Amino acid sequence: MLSDAPFEVPPYLLEKAKHLPRCPMAIAGADNEVVLASVRQATEAGIITPVLIGDADIIHSLSDVIGLKTDDLEIVDLTGEEAVSGAAVSLAASNSVKGIMKGHVHTDALMRAAVNRDTGLRTGRRISHVFHMTIPGRDKVLLITDGAVNVAPNVDTRMDIIRNAIDVAHALGNPEPKVAVLSGAEVVNPSMPSSVEGAEIIDRARKGEIDGCLIDGPFAFDLAVSPEAAKIKGIDSPVAGQADIVVVPNIEMGNGLFKMMVYFMSGLAAGIVMGAKVPIVLTSRADPPEARFAATIIAAIIAHGDST
């Protein structure tokens, strides 16, 4: 049942990457071979100028092994997750870098540094995670949010989650993404809180709290992505069956959804944290190199857009 098809970096991202200026990017926890291999790929492709943060001796040793030239690269010699994460965030807060890549540090450590009220990267929005999903052989991009950071977001938080995902879609060239707010069904049911909350989100969005998109819901997943399902169920909506962004009610749905696409369909899940002062590349240890590379390109695109 598991797919053995190779993972693919979306061609359109590779094309966009050709025209990008290098993005200065802090690598939080660069003292790891897998991380440095990703850094080498993105550096040689002209996507980033990395600032390597971690144990300098290990960084130099591993760089020699994988063939990463560090002579012209800045290395910040630090150990310990808190110190490494804090240094990456400090570089972003001072505008020394325009993006952060999570390397060999735990997500919690990096996120704690990013949301620190005194020294972090807070903006007026809630920080949230967006998966950029693509399937080999298909052109359609689907953004899934939030499957990694916010566990059980309330309606106000989900409004920011939606705004952050819309920003990603805009940066990638979709000026009016179709946003589907997910639940277990398309009918509002008081015994299904996500449907009630979904209806509230749509009502507030239509009153002007969210713009730059077409938004509808609550929808079950089939209605969000399948034109045939929408037709059979008689749903008349410009979003039904055409969603570019799906907004999940909780982390369990988002995490399960993206992993099913990865393992059953060889979907490439490029993870980005939005809502902070800079985009943060957030991938897991189980992710293929292609996912980290795609996420790095996306972060560079977003960072470039924020600086123009």
Describe these PLM feature segments.
Residues 1-52, 56-239, 244-308:
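Anion-binding alpha/beta catalytic cores of soluble intermediary-metabolism enzymes, centered on
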